[in-house]
Amino acid sequence: MSTETKKEKKLRNYKIKKALLISGIALLAVQLVATVVFMVILSKVRIVPKDYVIMIDVLLVLILTVVTITQRWVLPGIITKIISLLLSVVLIVGSVYLNVTYGAFKKATDINYTTTCLNVYVRADSKYEKLEDVKSEEFGIMKSLDRENTDEVVNKIQTEIDTTIKTKEYDDVQSLVKALYDKEINVIILGTSHLGILDSLDEFKDFKTFTKVIASYEMKKDIKNDDKKDDDYLNSDNVVTLYLSGIDVDGPPTENRNSDVNIIMTLNTSTGQILLLNTPRDYYVPTSVSNGEPDKLTHAGCYGIDCSVETLEMLYGINIDYYIKLNFTGFKSIIDSLHGVDVYSEFEFTSQNVKGYHFVQGYNHMDGEAALVFSRERYSFPTGDNQRGKNQMAVVNAVVKKLASSELLKNYTEVLDSISSSMVTDMSMDEIARLVDIQLKKNISWDIIQFAVTGSNGNLPCYSLKSPNYVMIPDDAVVEQAKTYLKKIHDNERVVIE
C-alpha cells in the first residue's frame, strides 16, 4: 500500500481548494445575478413598502459580501456556498412570483377606460346580412340615451358604405326595440349595455334570438380620475372606501353593463374593521344622470362605472375612493383557482334557477359554478333580492378569507391571472403599496361586518324603463341606519350590527 508524499498531499489540497474556489466564484456569480434581478423587480413592483425594500436590499448585499469573503477558507467557504445556493434558488423563485404579481396588478390598474359595444340589429328572419343590404333603410336610434356613441357609430357606418343614412329617433329603449318587433323599422342601433334592461321585460326576453347582428362597434371612453371630494360627504384619512361592482355577463370587465352586485367596502385602518354594505340591484333611487328621476340602481352601470359610484355617493352621503369592477361570471375562475371556498348560508334551499344545486344551512364548500348559482338565487327566499345581496356578500367574504390564507400560495400564479383577467380598478400601484405598508406595520386582524339595506316590492316606471317594472322601494329607516354605521366607521368607533 503506497503512502502519499507531502508533495502529492500538497497538490491534492491545492486542487481541492482550486475546485472550491472555482465553484465558489460560479455560485457567487449566480447569487449576484439573482440578487440584482430580485432587487430590480422588488423595486419595480412597488407594492412592498420602501422601508422593507431597503432592509431586504441591505441584507442581500451583506450576505453577498460575507459569502465573498469566506471563500478564502475551506470550511466557512463550504457552509456559505450552501447558503449561496439555497438563497439563489429562493431569489429566483421569488423573482418569478414578484414578476407575476407585478403583471397582475399592472394589468388590473393600467386600464383607465370603459368600453361600450353598439350593434346594428335586424330581425333574425330578415334577408339582411351586411350594412350594404340596409343602406336604403331608416335606422332606428335613441333620441338622448347614449347619443354621443350612437352619433359616432352613424358616422362610421356612413363612411363604410359611402352613403348618408336616414335615422329615426325614439325616446327610450323599449320604444326603439318595439318598433323593430312591430316592423315599423327594419334596423336599429343599440348598445349592448342596454340588453340587461331588455331582459327584465317579458315582451323582449327573446331579443337575442329574435334579432341578429350585422355590424358591431366598440367605443372607448376615458374614465375621469380626479381627487375631488365632496366636502358634504363623509371622508377620513384613515378610512378607505371601495365600491365593488359585479357585472354578471360574459365579456371584458371594462364593458358598461348592468351592475348586479353593488357592495361598498369601507376599511378603517385604525379600528381594524371592514364594513361590507350591500345595496340591492333593483333599489329605486335617482342616479347621477337621471335628473332626479328614480331608476334601478343596476341600470346606473349601463351609463358607466362613474355613474354607479356617484349614485351610491348620493344615496349614502359618502365619498367613494376607488372602485373594483368585476366580471362576476369570471369570478368562477378565481374561486376554482382557489380550489373552492367555504360560504355560509343562512338558509337551506334548492336553487330554482339551476337544477342540481342544493345548499344547507351553515357552511357549504363551493366551486366557482356553485358560488355563482348561490349568488344569483333570489326566488328561493321570502325576501328575494334582499337575501341575494346577503349571499353575494357571503361569497365575497369567503373569497377574501381564502385569499388572506396560506392556501393562496398553493396556486398563486393561476389565482392572480384569474383576478387580473376578470377585474379592473382605478386604484394606483402606489395606493395598493400604501395599504400593504399599513397592513405590514400594524399587522391588522380585520373584523369584517356586513349590513344590507332593504325595502319593499313595487312596480313602477324607471328612468331607463318607461313602463312599470319590478323595483325595490328603499326603506328610509334602514338607509339611515346604514348611514349611521358608515359615520361610526369614519369616526373611529367600533360598529356592532343590531
Regions found by a protein language model. Name each.
Residues M1-L11:
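Short, Lys/Arg-rich, polar N-terminal cytosolic tail immediately upstream
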Residues L11-I25, D51-I54, V74-K81:
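Membrane-water interface of alpha-helical transmembrane segments
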Residues L20-I69:
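Membrane-embedded alpha-helical segments of integral membrane proteins
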Residues G77-N99:
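Internal/C-terminal transmembrane anchor helices
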Residues I82-V90, E129-E132, T266-L267:
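A short, flexible N-terminal coil/short beta segment enriched in small residues
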